[in-house]
Amino acid sequence: MRKARLLATAFMLVVSLPAQSVSWRGNVTVQERLFFQDPADPRQHGNNFSVAAQPEMYHEWADGQQSVSFIPFARLDQGDDERSHADIRELSWSYVAREYEWTVGISKVYWGVTESQHLVDIINQTDLVEDIDQEEKLGQPMAKLSLIRDWGTVDLFVLPGFRERTFAGVKGRPRVIPRVEKDLARYESSQEGRHVDLAARWSHAIGDMDIGLSWFHGTSRTPILNPAQYNGEIVLAPFYQIIDQAGIDVQLTRGSWLWKLEAINLDGNYVKYKRATGGFEYTFYGIANSAADLGLVMEYLYDSRGELATTPFEDDFLTGLRLTLNDEQSTDALLGVIKDTHDDSYLVSLEANRRIGDSWKLSIQASKFLADGLDQSLKSFAEDDFLQVELGYYF
């Protein structure tokens, strides 16, 4: 109810703006997920259909110095009540001056350069019910001040209002086993979700290199999942600890080579670790005398916890191919394989996109999981190989 009232209030504020000064765009998508095996938990559904909408409103004045943006999102899912959800991705006011910028409200901030995972991207919470690749994020309340100088840009954040990570429900698929029970969520801070987090980032372009140094203090976006009893069932209970995280991201462009690195040091009272992802992408331009480009992607994924890591990517290699046709339909595809160095566990993923006409877009995603080792985090998805087909209308 609270979220519905907030969405309604935001909508009323937006429609009160002069119609001629507001620009609208957005998309409506239909999505089908096809699973190739019976679920590991008989309560989980099989193939699944859903519909989603994400309109976007933008209004600026004072010669573009001030602006307001509003991006709500909603999905109606056939099988998982937790995936049927709504969120305000963005509802913010921005003020742009010569040497500084303000953003106040609900917004999204992206940090990161690597392909396989984004370790430094900590401002927004992951909307995990949308996709297990952790690319989709929830809107985060914030006040952001950007100081623009010759020696770089400094972004300062005050982050009130913590967002809990979304997880698939009892019928949801793919999901971990045992499932996560959000009603059992606990916090290290006595303020729980009201703890005010702080963050800062310095970024700069130095020749062919883009570099970012970041710091975060507050409630971890990644919960510790502890076994617990819930209505006679073994589940996982999320625990959100207070952390300090320092991070670095670097991208170096040299001709056809693109070198990338992300690394973090996370310090908490309950869990401490170091993680890093680094590698390169080499692009073959105009393959076979065509307009198409083919990129070779290789990355190494490291976690100091080793086999004790709660992520499947603690000592793994990513090998991938990125095909970009550079045609009128903006056709592209990315095939990737993440392989564990200690056993035969791996994850294969495929993403492909193609525009149809001026307003339609077809997207295909496929994932295959193989867990022959001791990695329980990947074994949870062993029966959840799937093909996802999505058709979107963009206006």
What are these regions (language model features)?
Residues 30-38, 67-78, 89, 126, ...:
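Transmembrane beta-strand segments that form the barrel wall of outer-membrane beta-barrel proteins
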